Amino acid sequence: MTRCVSRAIATRSHLLVQAGTGTGKSLAYLVPAMVHAVEAGERAVVSTATLALQRQVLIKDAPLAADAVERTTGVRPSVALLKGWQNYLCRHRLAGGYPDDDSDTLFSAAEATPRARVGEGTEQSLGEQVVRVREWAADTETGDRDDLVPGVSDRAWAQVSVTGAECLGTSCPLHDECFPVLARAAAAEADVVVTNHAMLGIAAAGNPGVLPEHEVLVVDEAHELADRVRSQGTVSLSATAVARVAATARRHAGVVVTDLEEAGQNLQLALAELPDGRLTEGLPPALADALTLLEAACRQVLTDVREAAKAAGPASASGDAGAVALARTAVADMTDVVERMTSDSVAQRRDVAWVERPRLGAEPPRLTLSPIDVAGSVADALLADRAAVLTSATLALGGSFNPMAATLGLTLADADWEGVDVGTPFDYARQGILYTPTHLPRPGMGISEAALEEVVALAEASRGGMLGLFSSRRAAEEAAGVLRERTGLTVYAQGEDRLPTLVEAFAADEDACLVGTLSLWQGVDVPGRTCRLVVIDRIPFPRPDDPVSQARSEAVTAAGGNGFMTVSATHAALLLAQGAGRLVRRADDRGVVAVLDPRLRTARYGAFLARSMPPLWPTRDRDVVLGALGRLAAGQ
């Protein structure tokens, strides 16, 4: 892998590398990237999807790689960490330069940080959490939220941070001590910058300045990149959001917001007349008219807020500057969202739009827009004019790199690309069994009684040690209930506690079961006997009513391709590979992956899905599987 990465960097080409767990892929891309940086003076950006891998790269792997490069070249490469602006403490806000924010950030792009976070501070009140942050602020050298352990809630952190747009910049009296400014200065001088996929998503959405200049891009956990980029490009709007922005502008900038409030009410009326679901024919006339009125109102309020900002003057001269900056950012962000919604992006099939009503509470309906295809923006903003290495344990779907290459924009980029599978240190056929019980019925709307009985039989044979991956929360809850009712096993269920707490408890008990949904399919690393059985209730196709998948499939079909295989089957293959990959995490792991969906064996697309999974020994024989699980449970 190191040779392949070195060649891609030297030739400024693009490389997909499938490297299984245990191959040491972090060192395999860090060393050649660092050598190139110190010899050619060209910076590399390394991006991860999860906080866990980001920490591993920064704290463990990068120092090891730097040691090796220094011994070889005589020069030690420098490494810097870069995150989104709001992930850093704002000294000026802490000192009272901004008013307390009593509402959530509404329209800024999703914060550029992996979502997994250790500790949310839920045991403490908001005030207690803020006090703890203030005490930590006196000693921190980085201001990085993730250095605060245990962590605090998003609401508490919002009291001590700002977005990049809300920052007062050089007008701030504490600009020279600003944590995000210092982080960006360090990144601009470093040989290697470690960041995350959310930052890449912001760059792909039209803000390349969030990243320092770089000639080499390395994307680890690359199978998640397209979804992260799409997430950054997804925006929502509701009457409640409009009302909150209006209140922010009135409170912090003192401007008149009557027209904006009325436009928000008109939006609510227009959305209330529409059913939930995708707007397949574009925006209905009444909704389009409501958005046009809202756009005009936003622009007027934005003009007024900007005038208020001029009157407030620089932060050093007025305590109002921070408050007005909050108002300006809220209105400007909403204006950008509304302008996108009133553009022709839906009619031109660049975006897909849908109406949805929150499941809980009395929130009004909201309108959401999401990009249909992100391959072009990835190719243009992230891959063009630089070497790129994209790696993951799951890139060759159905035995081919072509599906992921198309999804990630490599087929559109101006450079040559190749896919390389460097293999795995594991002997999957000896270490694990892939069990597909073809006697079960084809899955319907929910999980069947027969499938629940199979879950119980497998868990009892294994005497626990089961990770259950289910396609819906309801199915996971039913499985947890049945396991508790019919077995004496300890069962941990997603939603009953914080996910890190549940995973930690599961890892500590060899005979427990952990069941959940999508959050458990990727990133759960529990080696050893604790996870000797992975149960997947059905092939994880996208929901039939998912607007983005529908629109993507239609676009592929319209272009002459196979929409089902390109979108739905590829989505399912990726998740199956990730889910099955939870079983074997080290060379002495053994166990069973059970997919309770006969379509994996009987459907025409089943072979494509099976080839995407680790090459476990396949069987349909229930007795063989139950016997193997019994021996594993007995420690044989």
Model-derived segments and spans:
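Conserved pre-motif I regulatory segment
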Residues: 1-18
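Walker A/P-loop NTP-binding motif
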Residues: 6-10, 26-40, 60-64
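A substrate-engagement module of RecA-like helicase motors
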Residues: 41-43, 48-191, 303-310
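A contiguous, basic/glycine-rich beta-loop/short-helix subdomain that forms a polymer-engagement track
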Residues: 155-191, 206-208, 308-438, 446, ...
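Conserved RecA-like P-loop NTPase helicase motor core
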Residues: 425, 437-446, 497-601
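Conserved interdomain hinge at the start of the Helicase C-terminal
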Residues: 437-471
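Conserved helicase motor "Helicase C" RecA-like lobe of SF1/SF2 P-loop NTPases
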Residues: 471-495
